[in-house]
Amino acid sequence: MLITWQDLSPETLENLIESFVLREGTDYGEHERTLEQKVADVKRQLQCGEAVLVWSELHETVNIMPRSQFRE
């Protein structure tokens, strides 16, 4: 189930994104990026619709994924 990021409080959204970024440990290439930069990147992706927040009823968790990978 999709969760609209605008429905979350700013603090909750920030915490979800930080948790996602820390969990993913994504490689950003030659230049290391700060946590704040990574969070800003994910937030921008949510705001422009490239990424979505997804609630898993099975696992009772929230995940962030590219919109193109989301299937209901």
Curated annotation (Swiss-Prot):
Domain of life: Bacteria
InterPro entries found in the cross-reference section: UPF0270 (IPR010648), YehU-like_sf (IPR036685)
SUPFAM superfamilies in the cross-refs: YehU-like
Family named by the database record: Belongs to the UPF0270 family.
Name under which the protein is recorded: UPF0270 protein YheU
Gene it is expressed from: yheU
